[in-house]
Amino acid sequence: MFEGERIAERLAAEQPQVHADLARIGVTGIYKGDGVVLRARRPILRHDETGRLAQVSFNNYDRDTVRLADDDMRALYAGIRAFDSMANEPEMQWRYTLRPGDMLVFDNWRVLHGRGAFRGKRKMAGAYIN
């Protein structure tokens, strides 16, 4: 897991143009499953009306086809590379092996999550609260 806001802050400080591009360029995410197709288009870094970071949407697996002008496409790919590079720095990550009975609660608009290799069986259940 890693805190998306922390990466956004680093990008703003170290690569301000990349941060601005990731806040400007809309990316479509898509989910298909269980008889539904959900699509949403938003920038990777979404800010509220006050300029405060409201949501980080970075998911390489749910990204739909991207159709952009050449300059925006290059800027988006540069931003994705920069974001992904920071996200994969060990000091940016928090790793924990869940045990039976453990519960993990986090803000899905701020914390990004994934999984690493493991041995054995696992069963997970997820829920969303609005």
Region spans (language model):
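Active-site environment of non-heme Fe oxygenases that use a 2-His-1-carboxylate facial triad
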Residues: 1-130
